[in-house]
Amino acid sequence: MTVLDLSYNFANLSVHDLLEARDTYHYHLLSKANVVGTAIGLYLIRKDEAWPTRKGEGKTPPNKKTYARTLSNSEVRDYSWPCILAFVRSWANEDAFGPAGRYDPAQIVPKTLYLADGRAVPVCVVQADQAGSDTSATYSPPGILPAHKLGGGSPIIVRVQGAEYSATAGCLVSDGHLTYALTARHACGEADTRIFSYLRSGEVEIGASSANQLTRKPFSEVYPDFPGRRSYVALDVGLVRLDQVDDWTSNTYGLPPVGPLGDVHEKNLSLRLIDQPVLGRGATSGLVRGTIKALFYRYRSVGGYDYVGDFLISPAEGLATRHGDSGMVWHLDATTEDDAANPKPLPKRDLRPLAVAWGGQVFEESGVRSAFSIATSLSNVCKLLDVELVTDQSRGVSGYWGRTGHYSIAAFAVALVGDTDLRDFLNRNLGILSFDLDTIAEKGFDKSVGQLGDNFVPLADVPDEIWKKLDHGKNGREGGRDVSAGPHGSDGPEHPNHYADIDGEIGPHKTFRAACLADDSNLTVDAWLQYYETMAAKAKADGDEDGARRHRNKLKQGLLPFRVWQFFDAMVAFVENKDVVGFLTAAGAAAHYMGDASQPLHGSVYSDGDASRTVTRHHPRTGEDEEVSYGSGVHSAFETAMIADKAAQLFPLIKQELSGPGGHALPLLTSGKAMAKATVELMDKVAGILEPMRILDSYEQAGAGTRKATLDGMWKDLGDDTAQVMALGARYLAMLWESAWVHGKGSDIPVRNLTDQNPQDVRARYIQTSFVPSLTLDKIGDELT
């Protein structure tokens, strides 16, 4: 090449240049039968191509590879230049075109597109055969759902003409008057169609579809400064008008608190976005990760018009989007790493909501299918719908809504264990028992539990997340112990093991709880069965037939202290048999029950309100007043919503309660019956510190529900005492662990066996229904020693 020959500096090409070239050659590219789509991006270099050692070798390598370039065998390198990407069904070398070749020369895709003013735009040909997508008829959750708050990543369900359609709630937006969940239009239906979602307890009705929806817009209307004469920007975005905004958080489940909008427009949109990492949470797939592979992907042409998606996103291995993830928001990972060798954990990453996933493109290569996500700019969506991104709705709620209490009590208890070998063993396996306290206190929390599904669940939540489930069906779990399904969730023998309504008045004692503490003969199965029969007879005499039936129902007769007795016996047996996996599994699950015992509402007939009196509440959906029990809804508001919302303030208070010397400071026990009595003792202490009716009164006086004002009011009234009862729970749990360890002669177990355990070995234990079996009160006696 001489100085007089034309030389093109492709690196100077802009997004505008690339779009202009594609627009100019619109019909030319459209005529290529082998071309299935085009986009703009950076030139893809085959991964085994030698890196250039001299100037110019990047574009013209001395030993250029000629085999088919695909999305999986090529990559963007730091010297990749701007180009138009042309995706073709099949690959053919140049000698296959022409008189002696198999193909018409007119069908060859040009290497360069030349504009009238002399600019030249390179074309990168990529083999990426389109394939049909996988679909699923009904929604199936990817893992454990939130117990309480809905937010980004929650499922959106609509039923139209006998069919069910699912999508994902991407984020919250507001028009200044109302707040909406943004999702895919196809899961909204016509205006005012009722929309549903799911929490752990089952299906919930959340609102109605808005008439404000998007389908497609002319490219020139969305991007007036960019060329695109015969193109549509494809959009599939709808809004759900929420019945109760306080049921929602602006955060995405399992991700850090939502960051500022990743604002994209003609003036700042550049190819620097190529290969940038993004992540999101789909209602079907759970956590997904990917990289931006191309911009303005033309995936279809109809009647001479192109249909274009703003972003083509390549999935990370094993983390692709699926049917039901439409509406999900992709977050740009804009984190600045302080140490590249130790990247920041997910809760501390800087994520910017960037794009709404509305569709997918499945490419097939050598029989392997890869689902790429097609997404549109969230800033464009907000502009076209005339709404703004909401970032401050219940910001403190993110990650594990409803788990904070159980996990934190287990984490605090480990440090209180006196036996050095046991404490070290539990510390080494804290990730199996629970999470470390700093992780639990993070507003974003980590992603682990939210992605679990039928994989490993930290033990402190196994009784809720595994055993209180069916072992089959849409919300089933392997290892589930429930036996019947109903309109409000499933039921089974595990459920009554989590509480004991023993503050009913009986005999000379003020409560049956007091009777158990005063006389050990009341700590028997027969005495408890008689107590429930007495309560049933009393309810019937008072005209409360529902109450009478409830007290006689075996699945409603709480037996929490006997469940702790059963676990003490099991842990002792595991230690005696030197079965460290069995002991660890039982110890972690037992943390859940001792956590329940430390919550006053788990030991009270007022567990979710006082049925003897009513209050008038305004129904958010019907707009009408309704009569409900006094304190109705208090259980989840106090134990789930308030504790999760105030975790960052609560944990320092608990640490202060536990700051003195002496570990748990409780005597070690040597029998299951003594441990059951200690559990009743704990329930009595916490009821004295935080009387159940006081919780109900605070809830009603603060306005009821789970609005921020309600949670703030309850925290002001109850915060200090909540820390005190949770600290007591940690002390009694540490005492339970250490008592079983010492009584079973844990000192006989070689220290070399007290190592890090495999979570899958632990899971293999707890999915067995015979592992510390869940039994009703009338059946548990045979298990107790």
UniProtKB/Swiss-Prot annotation:
It comes from the Bacteria. Transmembrane segments: none annotated. Its EC number is 3.4.21.-. Keywords: Antiviral defense, Hydrolase, Protease, Serine protease. Residues 470-481, 491-501 have a biased composition (Basic and acidic residues). Residues 470-503, 608-629 are annotated as: Disordered. Signal peptide: none annotated. Disulfide bonds: none annotated. GO terms for biological process: defense response to virus; proteolysis. GO terms for molecular function: hydrolase activity, acting on ester bonds; serine-type peptidase activity. Probably a dedicated protease for substrate gasdermin bGSDM; cleaves the bGSDM precursor, releasing the pore-forming moiety, which integrates into the membrane and triggers cell death. Involved in defense against bacteriophages. Expression of gasdermin bGSDM and this neighboring protease is toxic in E.coli on solid medium. Belongs to the peptidase S1 family. This is Probable serine protease Ga0098714_109514.
